[in-house]
Design a protein with these regions (language model features):
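Secondary-structure transition motif
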Residues: 1-127
Length: 127
């Protein structure tokens, strides 16, 4: 069993994911660049890997947008986030009415889902 934590980093000031990065003890994240060795990105959003993969074996991270054929509601498009009250990752979608607008993201749900984007590069998928 692999107990390593995996993260990905979105640099808001550059509108891109940082692929080669190091977190320092002071909380700064440095990025390797070809020009001056290392440069700092100050507006970083850190997203954790959930430990789950979708039906195409892609790693699911916080902020990913998934589509799943959910029995009760049909095709659902939602975003992955960590819900502190649940103590779990959930798939949350936009829904009005008295019914819940999320499901717990477990192995069965992940296996049935497909990553179609993320909240930074394809936010319109959630509209």
């Amino acid at each position: 069993m692999n107990n390593r934590f995996k993260f990905r980093f979105w640099c808001s000031s550059e509108n891109r994911f940082i692929t080669d990065s190091v977190i320092h003890g002071d909380g700064k994240i440095s990025v390797k660049t070809g020009i001056c060795g290392r440069d700092y990105c100050h507006d970083v959003v850190i997203q954790q890997y959930t430990g789950l993969t979708d039906s195409k074996d892609k790693e699911i991270c916080e902020g990913d947008i998934l589509i799943i054929d959910y029995d009760t509601f049909g095709n659902v498009i939602g975003r992955v986030l960590y819900e502190t009250d649940q103590g779990a990752y959930i798939l949350q979608w936009k829904r009005t009415g008295p019914n819940q607008n999320y499901i717990n993201l477990n192995c069965d749900v992940a296996f049935e889902s497909v990553i179609i984007g993320n909240i930074f590069e394809t936010p319109l998928l959630l509209k």
